[in-house]
Amino acid sequence: MAKDSKKTLRIESFDLSPGSSLTRKYEVIGKLGSGWEGEVYKIRERNTGIERAAKLFFPHRNPRNKTSKFYAQKLHKLRHCSIIIQYHTEEQITYRKTPITILVSDYVEGELLSDFLKRQPGQRLSPFQAIHLLHALAVGIEEIHLLHEYHGDLHTDNIIVSRYGLGFDLKLLDMFP
């Protein structure tokens, strides 16, 4: 860790272990992923046992909470879109004497579209499956566009396939920028 010119602590990883506590309300189950803005963990509400996802923002990527505020407001605006993971609340923790913003949202069971495709014969979908997947994606993106928003970074690692059968139930990750 090094400090940049604005004296914001530069954290590259939180490395939270399973069983760790977040704000006394949540217990860390495990790390789901990481990216430019921060890390995402699967967590469990202590009082209800409900599993959620928590995005912890790196402080140097979230100056004055601008990034997390924008992200939360965008998710709130898109809350009625079926393809969006539902945002619940913002929390604050202190990590190494630094305030860290956390956005808590629904935890969605499923797998990344990239992993789903790798498991398919020839790593591709049949034309019938592909049409259904593209239709589900187009309908979800249309809902977002009708609200004058966009994804900004749509690719197979930002799409979760949470149900597959006659149709696909898809959810989008990383709705920022």
Predicted regions and their residues:
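Activation segment signature within eukaryotic-like protein kinase domains
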Residues: L133-L134
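AlphaC helix of the protein kinase catalytic domain
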Residues: L113-R124
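Protein kinase glycine-rich loop
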Residues: I29-G35, V40
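Juxta-kinase regulatory segment immediately upstream of eukaryotic protein kinase catalytic domains
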Residues: M1-S21
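Short beta-strand micro-motifs within the conserved protein kinase catalytic domain, predominantly
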Residues: Q86-T101
